[in-house]
Amino acid sequence: MASLRKTHPLLKIANHALVDLPAPSNISVWWNFGSLLGLCLISQILTGLFLAMHYTSDIATAFSSVAHICRDVNYGWLIRNLHANGASFFFICIYLHIGRGLYYGSYLYKETWNIGVVLLLLVMATAFVGYVLPWGQMSFWGATVITNLLSAVPYVGGTLVQWIWGGFSVDNATLTRFFAFHFLLPFIVAAMTMLHLLFLHETGSNNPLGLNSDTDKISFHPYFSYKDLLGFAAVIILLTCLALFTPNLLGDPDNFTPANPLVTPPHIKPEWYFLFAYAILRSIPNKLGGVLALLASILVLMVVPILHTSKQRSLTFRPVTQFLFWALIANVAILTWIGGMPVEDPYIIIGQIASLTYFALFLLIMPMAALVENKVLGWQ
């Protein structure tokens, strides 16, 4: 008789996804980040739920309620530090996961990849509205600057901004709705994650060689379930160390000052994980152009599968494109640095060059390099 996990309607789904799933035998540690993102999402939802029990979404008490959580609630300081730094780990895992996808050609599973890009946009939206909730200086001014970008939309821009704000400035209505969005979006992310996995399991995982691995598969459990647990342990230890030893390392000191609409901070900047996109936004002198470039910096990922010109899937045996891939990583690091710098020379020109290089690498240089590699190998 077949075991219950293979026959029960609900357990059968879990079994096919987590136990008897055929997985390539050679997938490396770079394939761990999907499960780590699942861990981050669960961790963020749980810590966020406990924070929401004590938080008040009113401009008169929001800042004080966060202070109250840290001072008076049992382990509130720990829950808050885990939640704030958990967001950083979430984005570290996302960027490594995307980097893995770009390097090994996983983007050729188009449905999985496109849902992944939508997931990235949703997580970015969640993080943005979440950053506004403590109602510190950077929360308030970050919300003002970023929502104001919508005014660049032709014809309806002004109306759109007032609609988002719920008034004529970032005020109580804005904070209340941002709290509602911040509570709702993670559950939408969880639902989209299910779709992401559904489409992934239609094709099976890619592998470091970029070759068909149907002839060499092993079951997910116990091999990769234990491998994932090792990754979980590593991330939990790192997150706990960050939350306990240097909880404010990645935060902005300005956010320890309550929001004041009359005083603008000297340098308005988002959290570190948005700096690369913020640098691209700032490098274009035109408002609408900047907004479009900001959107394009993420949506460019959607055209990567269309621009795949190589006869090989992964970069494992493509040294020229490998070099360009690492140039792209360095470029994003430069953009991240520039995003945190004031708008003055030489930072302006460096940001503009890095922004141009970012798009050129995706849209022009890497597809052309792949064609050259095909020609050298006599594969065209």
UniProtKB/Swiss-Prot annotation:
GO terms for cellular component: mitochondrial inner membrane; respiratory chain complex III. It is found in: Mitochondrion inner membrane. Its main location: mitochondrion. The keyword Zinc does not apply. It holds the Pfam family Cytochrome_B. Heme b b562 binds at H83, H182. A ubiquinone binds at H201. GO terms for biological process: mitochondrial electron transport, ubiquinol to cytochrome c. Belongs to the cytochrome b family. The keyword S-adenosyl-L-methionine does not apply. GO terms for molecular function: metal ion binding; ubiquinol-cytochrome-c reductase activity. This is Cytochrome b. Heme 1 (or BL or b562) is low-potential and absorbs at about 562 nm, and heme 2 (or BH or b566) is high-potential and absorbs at about 566 nm. Heme b b566 binds at H97, H196. Binds 2 heme b groups non-covalently. Keywords: Electron transport, Heme, Iron, Membrane, Metal-binding, Mitochondrion, Mitochondrion inner membrane, Respiratory chain, Transmembrane, Transmembrane helix, Transport, Ubiquinone. CDD domains: cytochrome_b_C (cd00290), Cytochrome_b_N (cd00284). The chain crosses the membrane at residues 33-53, 77-98, 113-133, 178-198, 226-246, 288-308, 320-340, 347-367. It is a multi-pass membrane protein. It comes from Pagrus major.
